[in-house]
């Protein structure tokens, strides 16, 4: 989605978000339906939460923000542990979502450290409380490094993302990611779906994390769909949207990513 964000003057809500298509694809793979209880575990800055809200309340638009359906009890809980990112998340959701959703308690924002063993007890719906969970985990962020490199080429200066990156980040991040994945699984209802995603290029943060999780949680079911190969490279457990991926049967490259994601279902 590459449109300039616009504001609906009457209701002071923004109508567009510039979000990488791979991020939209990962959110769509959750198969969110009206009436679901959804948790966006690491939600800042908020683009994916807004994408999920569009699926939960398809009848709401920026120019008709008060038309909240009462025929289904959709719930969206957006969580972020970092204080600065939490403030940004809150500001963005207020800028895009009708106030009525928060006023009625249908959308809630929380600050919970989801790596804690007790985290699942602190979520509003608790253990096994959510039909769908999106875990866009913090990572070593090579995707942002690539974007920073392109900006640095244009400006001639090193971006903060490039200066902060270290080769050992993947090893430490994978431990955090596995803890987050286990918390997300505990919060998922039987029959529910979870999408684990990162913008890292490192297998240590992607399939390696999923492999470690499946070793301790063998009942988890990895979901596959043939349609994704038109947009992504298939990996052992998930999919990789890469900007140099050649779309099968064409001479076109995918303009999205990089983003890794894996779909898991709880029996």
Regions found by a protein language model. Name each.
Residues 194-267:
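C-terminal catalytic and target-recognition region of SAM-dependent MTase-like enzymes
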Residues 35-44:
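Conserved class I S-adenosyl-L-methionine
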Residues 128-183, 201-204, 216, 227:
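Mobile active-site "lid"/loop adjacent to the S-adenosyl-L-methionine
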Residues 1-9:
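Single conserved hydrophobic/aromatic residue that forms the stacking wall/gate
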Residues 79-127:
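S-adenosyl-L-methionine
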């Amino acid at each position: 989605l590459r449109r300039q964000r616009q504001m609906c003057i009457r209701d002071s809500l923004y109508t567009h978000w510039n979000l990488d298509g791979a991020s939209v694809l990962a959110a769509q793979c959750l198969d969110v339906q009206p009436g679901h209880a959804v948790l966006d575990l690491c939600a800042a800055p908020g683009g994916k939460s807004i994408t999920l809200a569009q699926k939960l309340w398809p009848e709401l638009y920026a120019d008709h923000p008060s038309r909240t359906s009462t025929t289904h009890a959709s719930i969206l809980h957006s969580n972020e542990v970092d204080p600065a990112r939490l403030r940004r998340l809150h500001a963005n959701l207020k800028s895009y979502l009708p106030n009525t959703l928060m006023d009625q308690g249908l959308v809630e924002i929380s600050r919970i450290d989801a790596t804690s063993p007790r985290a699942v007890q602190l979520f509003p719906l608790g253990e096994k409380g959510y039909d769908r969970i999106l875990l866009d985990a913090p990572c070593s962020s090579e995707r942002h490094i690539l974007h920073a490199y392109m900006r640095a080429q244009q400006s001639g200066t090193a971006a903060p993302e490039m200066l902060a990156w270290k080769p050992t980040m993947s090893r430490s991040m994978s431990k955090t990611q596995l803890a987050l994945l286990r918390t997300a699984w505990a919060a998922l209802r039987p029959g529910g779906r979870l999408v684990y995603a990162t913008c890292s290029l490192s297998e240590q943060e992607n399939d390696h994390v999923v492999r470690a999780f499946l070793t301790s949680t063998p009942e988890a079911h990895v979901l596959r769909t043939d349609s994704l190969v038109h947009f992504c490279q298939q990996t052992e457990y998930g999919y990789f949207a890469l900007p140099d991926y050649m779309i099968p049967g064409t001479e076109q490259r995918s303009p999205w990513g990089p983003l890794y994601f894996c779909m898991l279902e709880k029996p």
